[in-house]
């Protein structure tokens, strides 16, 4: 998911497998972005939501196509938030092109709604929802995701999330 991106992601697959190369090159064409430069080279764009989401989904689907090419096919797919798009595409619910172009638009809209540096998220590990609600009371932070037992994500203005994180 978002936050897991890093320069160089998918580069080894791109260089070794034509199937992965095709996904990256097609994404570059569909989005009119140089996905190789975005994903493989150090740059400031990779951490901006409007680029991050397309980069992560492109990388995920490129790797999945290589796995599929080697005869492995999932019986079930699942994803959370951004990962849902990969899961849906892998399951055949949408094309690779639609998944990548949709998350690019999603990222642009999210960036417009909350420009870089204004909002934040933090995973809280080991506290239950009631305790977290007590901690964030009086701040502008909110509960966002119940990821799994023992991990809840808070979100809000950057200063509110930082304030809640210190508590």
Model-derived regions: residue spans:
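Hydrophobic side chains within alpha-helical segments
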Residues: 56, 63, 84-89, 109
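Alpha-helix C-terminal capping segments
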Residues: 65-70, 88-94
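Alpha/beta catalytic cores of group-transfer enzymes, especially the acyltransferase/condensing modules
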Residues: 3-5, 29-31, 91-167
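Short amphipathic alpha-helical patches
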Residues: 37, 50-54, 62, 90, ...
């Amino acid at each position: 998911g978002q936050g897991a991106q890093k320069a160089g992601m998918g580069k080894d697959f791109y260089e070794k497998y034509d199937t992965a190369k095709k996904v990256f090159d097609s994404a570059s064409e569909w989005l009119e972005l140089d996905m190789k430069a975005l994903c493989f080279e150090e740059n400031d764009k990779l951490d901006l939501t409007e680029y991050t989401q397309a980069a992560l989904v492109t990388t995920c689907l490129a790797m999945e196509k290589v796995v599929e090419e080697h005869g492995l096919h999932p019986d079930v797919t699942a994803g959370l938030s951004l990962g849902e798009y990969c899961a849906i595409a892998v399951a055949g619910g949408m094309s690779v092109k639609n998944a990548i172009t949709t998350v690019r638009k999603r990222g642009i809209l999210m960036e417009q709604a909350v420009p870089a540096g204004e909002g934040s998220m933090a995973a809280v590990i080991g506290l239950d929802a009631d305790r977290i609600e007590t901690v964030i009371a009086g701040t502008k932070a909110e509960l966002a995701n119940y990821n799994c037992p023992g991990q809840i994500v808070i979100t809000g203005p950057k200063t509110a999330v930082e304030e809640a994180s210190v508590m």
